[in-house]
Amino acid sequence: MASHKELIKNGLWDNNPALVQLLGLCPLLAVSATVTNALGLGIATILVLVGSNLIVSLVRQWIPQEVRIPVFVMIIASLVTCVQLLMNAYAYGLYLSLGIFIPLIVTNCIIIGRAESFASKNDPLPAVLDGLWMGMGMTAVLVLLGAMREILGNGTLFDGADLLLGDWATILRIELFHVDSHFLLAMLPPGAFLGVGFLIALKNVIDKKMADRQPKEKAEIERVRIS
């Protein structure tokens, strides 16, 4: 069983679902135009990941091996429906903004992948923690990419935060600089691709720097005696 520290490290960095596994690229590229949209989808994804991992772990012994994938999909679809109804009731503006990408969480490879590779083989607590930290890793990349695109495209941060957090959140909006016309490349999918590529490259550079700082083991010299 993986330790909590390993689960955190895997979810946030070593096996990040967006930057390492390259899963969930469709919502990552389509929804991350603003921080608000990115954070909203990230929270929804975390809820579904944690819930699906917990349920799959609890019922894993009673699911026949031959039909496990359809059962996992049904569990995930049920949770996504619950999240969609909650968002419709309490964050209707964000619900309209995210649109089809909320129900498409059902097909997100991150969720079905964690259910199959981890939750179905581990106890409930590690499964919940795995879902939490994988979801946090995905949300962190979503928010970071959303911040990059929103700053470059609109010159703002947390625009539309009231859609997620309520009317009081209008005070969170920050205008970093005024733009007369939006930078469309940053707001459209090509800009999202470039942003993801930049984040992946940055992670690889950091990984290389960290690897170079690790003490290297000296090669053992094998002495051969010739007589």
UniProtKB/Swiss-Prot annotation:
Domain of life: Bacteria
Cellular localization per UniProt: Cell inner membrane
Keyword Cell inner membrane applies: yes
Membrane topology of this protein: Multi-pass membrane protein
Enzyme class, first EC level, given as a word: translocase
InterPro entries from the UniProt entry: NqrDE/RnfAE, RnfE
Gene designation: rnfE
EC numbers, comma separated: 7.-.-.-
UniProt protein name: Ion-translocating oxidoreductase complex subunit E
GO terms for cellular component: plasma membrane
Quaternary structure, from the entry: The complex is composed of six subunits: RnfA, RnfB, RnfC, RnfD, RnfE and RnfG.
Main location class: membrane
Family: Belongs to the NqrDE/RnfAE family.
Alphabetic keyword roster: Cell inner membrane, Cell membrane, Electron transport, Membrane, Translocase, Transmembrane, Transmembrane helix, Transport
UniProt cross-references to Pfam families, sorted A to Z: Rnf-Nqr
Membrane-spanning intervals of the chain: 18-38, 39-59, 69-89, 93-113, 125-145, 182-202
UniProt function note: Part of a membrane-bound complex that couples electron transfer with translocation of ions across the membrane.
Keyword Magnesium: no
Source organism per UniProt: Aliivibrio fischeri (strain MJ11)
Entry coiled-coil feature ranges: none
